[in-house]
From Swiss-Prot:
Organism: Bacillus cereus (strain ATCC 14579 / DSM 31 / CCUG 7414 / JCM 2152 / NBRC 15305 / NCIMB 9373 / NCTC 2599 / NRRL B-3711)
Record Pfam families: PLDc_2, PLDc_N
PANTHER family linked to this entry: CARDIOLIPIN SYNTHASE, CARDIOLIPIN SYNTHASE YWIE-RELATED
Enzyme superclass (EC): transferase
This protein's name: Cardiolipin synthase 2
Single GO MF annotation: cardiolipin synthase activity
Gene Ontology CC terms, in alphabetical order: plasma membrane
UniProt-listed GO biological process terms: cardiolipin biosynthetic process
EC number: 2.7.8.-
Annotated keywords: Cell membrane, Lipid biosynthesis, Lipid metabolism, Membrane, Phospholipid biosynthesis, Phospholipid metabolism, Repeat, Transferase, Transmembrane, Transmembrane helix
Family: Belongs to the phospholipase D family. Cardiolipin synthase subfamily.
Keyword Lipid metabolism: yes
Length: 514
C-alpha cells in the first residue's frame, strides 16, 4: 500500500510538472491569442515549484526516513521550494534505491556465501577477547567475511610510504592487478601509476581498474584512452550523464582497493594524486593512513572488488586463481577482517560495527576522522563512554576542505566536551585518516569517515584488526599526531563568537543532506 501511494505521488509530480510547463508555454508565447493579460510568468513558475515541492514532501513523508532527515527536507522544500526541488532531484531521491541495488545485493550475498570460509575461529577469538564477543557475532550476522589469522598486516603512514609500497607492489605483479579508487588525478603520481599499468599490461598481466565517475570527474579522456588502448580495462563506477535526472549521483564508490596477484592488497584513506603526497599549497602536509595486507584476508578484499566489477560490467570473474590467497604461516599475526559497507547493504554495516566497537571499550576510544557528522546512535555512544570514565579522544583537521562539513562537525563539539570527550585539531597539515582504536588492541582502518554519508550513501571498505602489530603502530602514530595538534577546551570553545555559532548551527541543520 505504501509503495502504491509513493508511485501515485510520483505520477502526480510528473503530471504537475507537465501541466505547469504547458501553462508556461501558453503564457509565454500565446497569451494574446488565448486572451490572458498581465499574467506573471514568474508567478506561474513559482506555483509550479511550490506544487512540485509539496508533492515531493509527500513522497519523503511516506518513505519513513529518519525524523531528522524528513524534517530537514520538509523545511528546505517549504522555505526554498525552487532550491529544494533541484536539491531533491540531485541528492534526495530514495524512490529507486531498493530496486537499483536489489540485483547487486543478491549477487553479493550469493558470492559471500560461496566463498565465506567455515573455519571454526570463534573459540580462539573469544579466548582473548571475551568482552568483544558482541562485535564478533555482529560482524558475522552483518555478512562480514571470516577473520583471518594467517595474514600479515602493516600500517603505512602517509603518502610517501604508502605509494612507495603500492608502486613496488604493482611492479611485482605477475598475473593480475585490480584497482578501485574514488579519486584518480592525471598528475605526476597518476602518470607514474598509469605508465606501470601500461607496462604490466604489455607483459601479459591482466589489469582491471574501477574509478568513481564523480570523484574522478576531472580525469582526462586521454588518460583513460591511453590505458584502454594498452589493454587495461578502465571502467567508471556509476557514470552520470544527466545529474538532475539521475539519482545515482548520490551513491558514490569511496573505496580505495589494490589487489596484486590475489595475495597482496592495500586499503585505506589515500586516493591517487599529488595532493596526497603533500604537494597542494593549501593543504600542505597530508596526514593519512593506509594498510598493507599479505595472505589469506586478501581474498576478502579481492571478493569485494570482483563484486563491484561484476555490478558495473556484467563480467563474472570466477577463475579459481583469483580467490586462492596463500595463508601466511605462523600464529602471531593477530586477526584481520574486511568489511564492505554501502547503500546496497540491508544494514548500515560499518556504522553498526563502529557502534559495537565503542560499546565494547573498557579503557579507551581514539578516533581520527576528517569529517564528523554522527547520527544520534554514535553520538550518544561516545558521550556515554566518556561519562563512564573511558578515555575518549577525537582528532580532526584544523582547516577545512569542505567548509559545510567542517562547521557542521564543530557544532557537535560542545556536547562532546561537556561529556568529557577530549577533542584535538591537527595543525601540521590536513588530517585525512579514518581510524578507530579501542583499548589499544582493536582497530578499524579504511575508507569510511565518521559521518552519515559514509554510513548511508557511499560504498566503503574497512579492515577490522584484532591484536595485530599494525595496531601498535596505529597507537603510536595517533600519539605522534597529538603532538602536532592543539586540544580544544570547553571553557574556551563555548565563548566562540555568535556568528560562528550561527554558521555551525545552520550547517548542522542541513547535516542530514550533506
Amino acid at each position: 500500500m505504501k509503495n502504491t501511494l509513493k508511485l501515485i505521488f510520483f505520477i502526480l509530480l510528473l503530471f504537475a510538472l507537465f501541466v505547469s510547463l504547458r501553462m508556461f508555454i501558453d503564457v509565454a508565447f500565446y497569451s494574446d491569442v488565448i486572451g490572458i493579460k498581465d499574467v506573471s510568468i514568474l508567478g506561474i513558475i513559482s506555483i509550479l515549484f511550490t506544487v512540485s515541492a509539496f508533492l515531493i514532501g509527500c513522497v519523503i513523508f511516506l518513505e519513513n526516513r529518519h525524523p531528522s532527515k524528513t524534517l530537514t527536507w520538509l523545511i528546505v522544500l517549504g522555505i526554498f521550494p525552487v532550491f529544494g526541488f533541484f536539491a531533491y532531484l540531485l541528492f534526495g531521491q530514495n524512490f529507486r534505491r531498493k530496486r537499483m541495488f536489489q540485483k547487486k545485493a543478491l549477487l553479493d550475498e550469493q558470492a559471500f556465501l560461496q566463498y565465506k570460509g567455515h573455519e571454526d575461529y570463534e573459540e580462539r577469538i573469544l579466548r582473548n577477547h571475551k568482552h568483544q564477543e558482541l562485535l564478533f557475532r555482529l560482524a558475522d550476522r552483518l555478512g562480514a567475511l571470516n577473520i583471518s589469522f594467517q595474514t600479515e598486516t602493516r600500517t603505512l603512514t602517509n603518502g610517501d610510504e604508502t605509494f612507495r609500497a603500492i608502486l613496488n607492489g604493482l611492479k611485482r605483479a605477475k598475473h593480475h592487478i585490480h584497482m578501485e579508487y574514488y579519486i584518480v588525478r592525471d598528475d605526476k603520481l597518476g602518470t607514474e601509476i598509469k605508465d606501470i599499468l601500461i607496462q604490466k599490461s604489455k607483459e601479459g598481466v591482466v589489469v582491471r581498474f574501477l574509478y568513481d565517475a564523480v570523484g574522478s570527474f576531472k580525469l582526462s579522456k586521454s588518460y583513460i584512452e591511453e590505458l584502454n588502448d594498452a589493454g587495461v580495462e578502465m571502467i567508471p563506477f556509476f557514470p552520470v550523464r544527466f545529474p538532475i535526472l539521475n539519482d545515482k549521483i548520490n551513491y558514490r564508490n569511496h573505496r580505495k582497493i589494490v589487489v596484486i596477484d590475489g595475495n597482496e592488497g592495500f586499503v585505506g584513506g589515500l586516493n591517487i594524486g599529488d595532493e596526497y603526497l603533500g604537494k597542494n599549497k593549501y593543504f600542505g602536509f597530508w596526514r593519512d593512513t593506509h594498510l598493507y595486507l599479505r595472505g589469506e584476508a586478501v581474498q576478502s578484499l579481492q571478493l569485494i572488488f570482483l563484486q563491484d566489477w561484476f555490478y558495473m560490467t556484467g563480467e563474472a570473474v570466477l577463475a579459481p586463481e583469483y580467490l586462492q590467497a596463500k595463508a601466511v604461516e605462523g600464529d602471531h599475526w593477530g586477526g584481520v577482517q574486511l568489511v564492505a559497507g554501502g547503500p546496497d547493504n540491508k544494514w548500515e554495516t560499518i556504522k553498526h560495527l563502529y557502534f559495537a566497537m565503542i560499546a565494547s571499550a573498557r579503557k579507551s576510544i581514539w578516533i581520527a576522522t576528517p569529517y564528523f557528522i554522527p547520527d544520534d546512535d554514535i553520538l550518544s555512544a561516545l558521550k556515554v563512554a566518556a561519562l563512564a570514565g573511558i578515555d575518549v579522544r577525537l582528532l580532526m583537521p584544523s582547516k577545512p576542505d569542505k567548509r559545510t562539513v567542517f562547521y557542521a562537525s564543530r557544532s557537535y563539539f560542545p556536547e562532546l566536551l561537556d561529556a568529557g570527550v577530549k577533542i584535538y585539531e591537527y595543525e601540521k597539515g590536513f588530517l585525512h585518516s579514518k581510524i578507530v582504536i579501542v583499548d589499544s588492541d582493536l582497530a578499524s582502518i579504511g575508507t569510511a569517515n565518521m559521518d552519515m554519508r559514509s554510513f548511508h550513501l557511499n560504498f566503503e571498505v574497512n579492515a577490522f584488526l584484532y591484536d595485530t602489530d599494525s595496531i601498535r603502530k596505529l597507537v603510536q602514530d595517533f600519539k605522534d599526531d597529538l603532538e602536532e595538534s592543539s586540544e580544544i577546551h570547553g571553557d574556551h570553545f563555548h565563548k566562540r563568537r555568535l556568528h560562528r555559532r550561527i554558521v555551525e548551527s545552520t550547517y548542522r541543520l542541513l547535516s542530514p543532506l550533506l
